[in-house]
Amino acid sequence: MAWPLCTLLLLLATQAVALAWSPQEEDRIIEGGIYDADLNDERVQRALHFVISEYNKATEDEYYRRLLRVLRAREQIVGGVNYFFDIEVGRTICTKSQPNLDTCAFHEQPELQKKQLCSFQIYEVPWEDRMSLVNSRCQEA
């Protein structure tokens, strides 16, 4: 009688250890799935920098705009990586021709701030060192 009980306990203990060591649901990456992106990840930061650069190239405003905050950042692994960003950008006091634009202060006066909420999709092929803007949409905040 003791052997079946010991065997059952051993099986239960083995299963508990196996479950504890298996990847959690949130740790599994499924190709094509969309997941929250880690804002501290160097690749995500590079994609955000690319977004702001492309955004400033496309605007006719003489003033540089920079990131105020990230509302949402997601990524999707496909034949490369799709990044989806929802961000808020603000107008700085620097013109686009000035150096060190990443540290420019934002306009203080409300009529000059011209904040915008934007959504961007970026496609990156890391092994080809290629990044492209797929989709962008902005509206006044």
Curated annotation (Swiss-Prot):
Q: In which tissues is it expressed?
A: Expressed in submandibular and sublingual saliva but not in parotid saliva (at protein level). Expressed in submandibular gland and parotid gland.
Can you say what this protein is called?
A: Cystatin-SA
Gene Ontology cellular-component annotations: cytoplasm; extracellular space; vesicle
Record motif Secondary area of contact, residues: 76-80
What PROSITE patterns does UniProt report for this protein, alphabetically?
A: CYSTATIN (PS00287)
Gene3D superfamilies recorded: 3.10.450.10
Which SUPFAM superfamilies does UniProt cross-reference here?
Answer: Cystatin/monellin
Biological function: Thiol protease inhibitor.
- Signal peptide positions (record): 1-20
Family of the protein in this entry = Belongs to the cystatin family.
- The answer to whether UniProt assigns keyword Signal to this entry is yes
Q: Where is this site: Reactive site?
A: G32
List GO BP terms, alphabetically. detection of chemical stimulus involved in sensory perception of bitter taste
The record's keywords, sorted A to Z, are: Disulfide bond, Protease inhibitor, Secreted, Signal, Thiol protease inhibitor
Compartments (UniProt record): Secreted
Point out the gene that encodes the protein: CST2
